[in-house]
Amino acid sequence: MKMRLQNEILSDIDQFEPSPEGDWRGLDALLTELWQTTKVNEACLPVLFRVFERFPDDSSAGVCWGIVHGIESTDLDYEKPLRESLARRSSELGQIMLHRLEKWTASAQ
């Protein structure tokens, strides 16, 4: 199987829509592909946060938590892009991430 470029995976994530039946497995597969085959960097953040903006109430049956855990497992400074995303459209998981980030920052001081 040919490994795809990061921008191809991100484009598919950006265009993802769950099936009419509410099947999110396609996004789950895309996120797995992104985390396992590429070096996630700052360029990925806007696309990943746009998923939260498009689905602000997280109806993904837990799939979008993969974005939360994946980003939090990196050493990326994601606070600014997260705040920008929340300014465009507040989202449940975006707010959770910001709260967790602020809590972690406060405890690290």
Which residues does each predicted region cover?
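Alpha-helical interaction scaffolds
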Residues: 14-15, 78, 89-108
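Amphipathic alpha-helical scaffolding segments comprising HEAT/armadillo-like alpha-solenoid repeats
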Residues: 2-13, 40-53, 76-86, 107-109
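Solvent-exposed, amphipathic alpha-helical segments
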Residues: 8-19, 30-33
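Alpha-solenoid helical repeat architecture
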Residues: 17, 52-56, 71, 86, ...
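Structural detector for internal amphipathic alpha-helices that build alpha-solenoid repeat scaffolds
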Residues: 25-39, 62-73, 95-107
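Structural detector for tandem alpha-solenoid helical repeats, activating at a conserved register
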Residues: 43, 62, 77, 92-93
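HEAT-repeat alpha-solenoid elements in large eukaryotic scaffold proteins
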Residues: 18-29, 44, 53-57
